């Protein structure tokens, strides 16, 4: 009921499969409103658009090629309607590891990047305690050093800074940058820190981005330094996601930044071992939906502000903005050292 008060939910899939699961779970006094297009949705009910073959085979608790194919069909159908502004946001339920593996892409983020013809894209893990972006997504560990370049780090810092400002309404984001090597912060920076990461951070600062680091991942999280920052940029996915889940796994969600559309997903695993037992925790999916709705509201607010901007005030002509930025950075460093 609360979700219907905040939005008009539309499920993309098969009404027949949904009815089968409802029967398995013995859910009474609930039915989905089958519609053909978003304009027919009932604001007081949960709606479903049939975009998958009704004869699709259902294997409880198993990911199959048929289920993965149905997932991609539903995703493409929903994205088409999202592109036409027929819906406002898209939130994905937990999926199996091969759901978005295609000939064109090996992950959802890669697929979305190809669909929208952009490499300036990043998944951001979001919880109440921490936000985390990544220089590299889910790539093989041996490929990480080749992708951790000054250019890529600067691009990700810029994207993360822009996203925090526009989609999360954080006016002056403070971003912590993790090192690639474990000995960072012990006076033993590796070649990657000295020649790649630090120069990228310095370039970002020249552009007005409050980036600080590099930090050792172990020390950064064990000493709870993340509490001083608005977001963290990890060098690779496993470096960040394990630490992220140790800080705040419950109800965390993922937001795909850098797209013209709003897309979020739950970080919860599909937990095939308990399928059909009515034991799943829906909070992760619920939070992913709330996250997408919040971003939608923030973007609409930004559009309105741009329509009626305040009179321009030339900061550069009236103050030394770079000095202010340096003072803020030094202040954060002093807090971390205390």
Label each region the model flagged.
Residues 1-338:
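Anion-binding alpha/beta catalytic cores of soluble intermediary-metabolism enzymes, centered on
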């Amino acid at each position: 009921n609360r979700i219907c008060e905040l939005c008009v939910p539309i499920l993309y899939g098969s009404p027949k499969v949904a009815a089968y699961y409802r029967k398995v779970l013995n859910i009474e006094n609930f039915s989905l409103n089958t519609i053909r297009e978003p304009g027919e949705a009932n604001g007081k009910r949960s709606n479903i658009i049939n975009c998958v073959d009704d004869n699709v085979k259902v294997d409880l608790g198993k990911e199959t090629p048929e289920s993965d194919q149905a997932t991609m069909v539903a995703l493409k159908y929903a994205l088409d309607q999202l592109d036409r502004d027929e819906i406002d946001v898209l939130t994905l339920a937990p999926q199996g590891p091969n759901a978005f593996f295609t000939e064109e892409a090996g992950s959802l983020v890669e697929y979305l990047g190809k669909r929208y013809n952009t490499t300036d894209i990043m998944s951001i893990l979001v919880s109440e305690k921490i936000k985390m972006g990544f220089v590299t997504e889910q790539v093989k560990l041996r490929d990480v050093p080749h992708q951790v370049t000054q250019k890529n780090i600067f691009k990700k810092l810029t994207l993360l800074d822009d996203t925090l400002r526009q989609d999360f309404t954080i006016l002056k984001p403070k971003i912590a940058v993790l090192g690639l090597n474990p000995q960072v912060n012990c006076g033993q920076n590796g070649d990657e820190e000295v020649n790649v990461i630090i120069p990228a951070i310095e370039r970002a600062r020249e552009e007005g981005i409050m980036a600080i680091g590099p930090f050792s991942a172990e020390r950064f999280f064990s000493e709870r330094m993340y509490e001083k920052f608005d977001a963290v940029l990890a060098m690779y996915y496993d470096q960040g996601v394990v630490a992220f889940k140790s800080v705040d796994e419950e109800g965390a969600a993922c937001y795909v930044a850098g797209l013209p559309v709003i897309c979020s997903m739950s970080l919860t695993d599909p937990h095939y071992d308990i399928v059909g037992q009515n034991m799943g925790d829906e909070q992760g999916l619920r939070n992913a939906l709330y996250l997408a709705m919040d971003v939608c509201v923030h973007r609409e607010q930004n559009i309105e502000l741009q329509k009626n901007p305040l009179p321009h005030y030339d900061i550069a002509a009236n103050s030394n903005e770079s000095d202010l930025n340096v003072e803020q950075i030094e202040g954060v460093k002093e807090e971390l050292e205390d």
